[in-house]
Amino acid sequence: MDKHARICIVGGGPAGTSMAMYLEKNGYDNYVIYEKTGRVGGKAFSPKMMVKTKDGKEEMRTIEMGAVMGCGTYFAVHECEEFGGATHADGPAMGRRFTNVDGTPLKSSKLALLKKYMKMKKLSRLLKKKYKGYDVNGHRGVAQGRYEGPCPSPEMKLAHIEGENPNLKDLCLPFSEFLKKNHCEDAELVWKGPFTSFGYGYFDEIPAAYVLKYLDAFTVAQFLSTGNLWTWKNGTESIWQGVNAHLKHPVVLNSEVTAVDRSGEKVVVTINNSQKEEFDKLILCTPLELFLKYGDPTDEEKELFSKIEHKEYFTMAVRPAEKDAPDISYYYFANMTPETRGHLMVFYHRWPDCGPQPLVTFTLRNHEGMEDIPFEEAKATTLKDMEISHLPVEKVERIDDWYYFPHVSCKDYAEGWYDKVEAMQGKKNTYYAGEVMSFGDMEETAEYSRDLVRRFFQK
């Protein structure tokens, strides 16, 4: 491809900013990134709020309203850190307590914990032996029993691999059925904490591929041992602010792409319903289903993108009374079920060296085939759950209602949705990236941007 091609990147989140970084590294620096909001980072959002230190002093510190953590397999995120000057070396230590709905500690016998650990090890061995290629970034070929893409294992460190493995077709099953098929049902408890509580859905509805590509065996082990997790003192948002600050062409903020015309040789993009710009290539790094509203979708794009679903997930920064302030994050496993959607699943206590501080609650409102819990009802339920935990909320600092985890159903996954979309890459001078093409977390999204550049924008 012509290194001077003018490239339009839609979206200034992790997908878009990392895309520009990797394009630059391959010699493509004639790009423009448009972001409709006034900041970069997308769901990596770390506003500052008042906390009290242990000696009673008030300080402004970052609070995570979206992405919270990473781990040792975040190779693409680490490349972004190095490029932009961010670091996870000084982030606050993670801690957690598994609790009953009333906030009392959830007691597990040593035997029960041992059984859970053994089930995790059993599934980890099975994945390595039977499902080679399951952890490769992206979804190309999975429904046909193939794997192709960067491998995020500690040994491979995003090296490209590809091959055939008919067993990978099992990843189209709901994760609960996948576990049942492999006699590993108890492993669900291990995977549920970092998956369902952070808004990615329930295991009876979500294809196993999403679960296991995000939470491969090594990553799950990292999540179980909180001491290995990465956090950022300046917040996850600082990663993408750093990348943006070091790009040759920083993100153009407050600039919404409101129309796209691909009828000619060039791609004509309209910004904020007024300014028109011509480009040679278009890279979509925002939800593809939204392109149906502002773009000029083909019949194939309409058919495929209309099948994308997403999760109704919101976070709230809340303050309980100072006398009630907890000293650690709480996980409520009893509330991580389809029947308890709309309830508090976890709250994040960010600063262990501080006393009273905003706690961030995480609540999921929908399940495929079930009625959505209305936002106001879920908000009231979440606040009531805090009260039941003996942490009545005195003030809600802010609420972020996220457009979360775009994905496709098990049926559409099995019918080759991803291979159909991947076959469109480059047609009409358009490329597709962002969360739905990999997974809705920082690392998977950045890995996909990295690989898209490798595939189509060679050095």
Where are these regions (language model features)?
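Conserved flavin/dinucleotide-binding core of flavoenzymes
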Residues: Y348-K459
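Conserved Rossmann-like nucleotide-cofactor binding loop
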Residues: A15, R39, E289
